[in-house]
């Protein structure tokens, strides 16, 4: 499980699994990306982060406020080939990102201004290890009626590990089989399902994928013990 201590001490070359050297971003590249993002800060208001995946149940951030909300214009998609963390180059899985169209519900976190760069540096180490996302300022509609500007990690379709085919029948076998140093790919999907249920949120785009992955696991692990890597 990713924790603050893990992120602070992690050697990005090894902590998440074997990452192809050509894909791995240096600390300097991450810092430049963060600086470029902050240079585009739309106003002097607080900085919010939008979590639509594991940031919802495990932010590992120091924040002053959180609120559920909706991002219009983007939807969840398992469109990132996963070769580290919960997958390997030999048996890749799929990781969550955002693609254009639709809407996404999630959790927004307001970061403290006095430690803003420290928190964002940790976040960039977590999310931008290979530069697979485009950190983008977007307007969020919070459930309490406010509209805020937030940093959102959107899939970069130019990234070498971007996968355009996100049909359930294509990606379910990958997710059901993949695992890595951070656990199984399937457990990530199920944690997402559980968090959405807990928050009273619905994402119909995940339904077919959840059904397919659970069916594959039931067929291959009838005793209920998840042993990854069956494919």
UniProtKB/Swiss-Prot annotation:
Query: Entry's Gene3D superfamilies?
Result: Gamma-glutamyl cyclotransferase-like
Q: Which GO terms describe its cellular component?
A: cytoplasm
> Which residues constitute the catalytic centre?
127 (proton acceptor)
Binding-site list for substrate = 49-54
Q: Would the keyword Ribosomal protein be found if you checked this record's keyword annotation?
A: no
Keyword Lyase assigned: yes
One of the entry's Gene Ontology molecular-function terms is:
glutathione specific gamma-glutamylcyclotransferase activity
Keyword annotations for this protein, in alphabetical order, are: Lyase
* One BP term from GO: glutathione catabolic process
Name the protein family. Answer: Belongs to the gamma-glutamylcyclotransferase family. ChaC subfamily.
> What PANTHER family does this protein's entry cite?
CATION TRANSPORT PROTEIN CHAC-RELATED, GLUTATHIONE-SPECIFIC GAMMA-GLUTAMYLCYCLOTRANSFERASE 2
Q: What is this protein called?
A: Glutathione-specific gamma-glutamylcyclotransferase
Species annotation = Escherichia coli (strain K12)
């Amino acid at each position: 499980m990713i924790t603050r201590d893990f992120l602070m001490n992690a050697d990005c070359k090894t902590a998440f699994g074997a990452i192809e050297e050509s894909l791995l971003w240096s600390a300097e590249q991450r810092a430049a990306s963060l600086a470029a993002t902050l240079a585009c800060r739309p106003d002097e208001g607080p900085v919010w982060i939008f979590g639509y995946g594991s940031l919802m149940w495990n932010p590992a951030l120091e924040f002053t406020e959180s609120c559920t909300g909706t991002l219009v214009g983007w939807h969840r998609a398992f469109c990132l080939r996963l070769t580290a963390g919960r997958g390997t180059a030999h048996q890749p899985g799929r990781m969550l990102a955002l693609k254009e169209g639709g809407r996404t519900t999630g959790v927004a976190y307001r970061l403290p201004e006095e430690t803003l760069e420290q928190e964002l540096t940790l976040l960039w180490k977590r999310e931008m290890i290979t530069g697979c996302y485009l950190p983008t300022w977007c307007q969020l509609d919070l459930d309490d009626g406010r509209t805020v500007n937030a940093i959102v990690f959107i899939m970069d379709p130019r990234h070498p590990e971007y996968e355009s085919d996100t049909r359930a029948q294509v990606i379910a076998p990958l997710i059901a089989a993949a695992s890595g140093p951070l656990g199984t790919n399937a457990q990530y999907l199920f944690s997402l399902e559980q968090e959405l249920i807990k928050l009273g949120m619905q994402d119909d785009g995940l339904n077919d994928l959840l059904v397919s992955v659970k069916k594959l696991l039931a067929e291959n692990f009838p005793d209920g013990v998840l042993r990854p890597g069956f494919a």
